[in-house]
Swiss-Prot record:
The organism's taxonomic lineage, starting at the top: Bacteria, Pseudomonadati, Pseudomonadota, Gammaproteobacteria, Enterobacterales
GO MF: ATPase activator activity; identical protein binding
Gene Ontology CC entries for this record: cytosol; plasma membrane
Gene Ontology terms describing biological process: division septum site selection; regulation of division septum assembly
Organism in which the protein naturally occurs: Escherichia coli (strain K12)
Keyword Cell cycle listed: yes
InterPro entries: MinE (IPR005527), MinE_sf (IPR036707)
Protein name: Cell division topological specificity factor
Protein purpose: Prevents the cell division inhibition by proteins MinC and MinD at internal division sites while permitting inhibition at polar sites. This ensures cell division at the proper site by restricting the formation of a division septum at the midpoint of the long axis of the cell.
Gene: minE
């Protein structure tokens, strides 16, 4: 009987399979979502503020928004500042 139970317990019911597939689809959608509509304007505004104090190339500023599990969003801002000698 134990051998029969072993083989029968390995089968997954269709609800669990469907749940796993749906979780995969949701995770893929979260990763592939387009950036929010406000992100380009946010990048532009941040660049304008930085340019008030330091002359930089607009390509030296990157803004990324990363979605984590649940309702957590991480805004990553990378700015490459010129050398101190170039500021004078």
């Amino acid at each position: 009987m134990a051998l029969l139970d072993f083989f029968l317990s390995r089968k997954k019911n269709t609800a669990n399979i469907a749940k796993e597939r749906l979780q995969i689809i949701v995770a893929e959608r979260r990763r592939s979502d387009a950036e929010p509509h406000y992100l380009p304007q946010l990048r532009k505004d941040i660049l304008e503020v930085i340019c008030k104090y330091v002359q930089i190339d607009p390509e030296m500023v990157t803004v990324q928004l990363e979605q984590k599990d649940g309702d957590i969003s991480i805004l990553e801002l990378n700015v490459t500042l010129p050398e101190a000698e170039e500021l004078k």
